[in-house]
Amino acid sequence: ASKTPVGFIGLGNMGNPMAKNLMKHGYPLIIYDVF
């Protein structure tokens, strides 16, 4: 079974480690962040 994509709007101090952990476990990510 494929994993559900997870979306993040802004990574910041909390979202960055969460996104890295999800990527490590094979979740496809959709990320929007303004630099």
From Swiss-Prot:
UniProt keyword annotations, A-Z: Acetylation, Branched-chain amino acid catabolism, Mitochondrion, NAD, Oxidoreductase
Keyword field contains Oxidoreductase: yes
Record's catalysed reaction(s): 3-hydroxy-2-methylpropanoate + NAD(+) = 2-methyl-3-oxopropanoate + NADH + H(+)
InterPro entries: 3-OH-isobutyrate_DH-rel_CS, 6PGDH_NADP-bd, NAD(P)-bd_dom_sf
Sites of N6-succinyllysine modification: 24
Coiled coil region boundaries: none
Modified residues (N6-acetyllysine): 24
UniProt: NAD(+) binding residues: 4-33
Top-rank lineage group of the source organism: Eukaryota
GO function term, MF aspect, one: NADP binding
Known pathway: Amino-acid degradation; L-valine degradation
Keyword Oxidoreductase: yes
Pfam family, one: NAD_binding_2
One GO location term (cellular component): mitochondrion
Record-stated family: Belongs to the HIBADH-related family. 3-hydroxyisobutyrate dehydrogenase subfamily.
Subunit structure and binding partners: Homodimer.
Name this polypeptide is given: 3-hydroxyisobutyrate dehydrogenase
Organism name: Oryctolagus cuniculus (Rabbit)
Gene for this chain: HIBADH
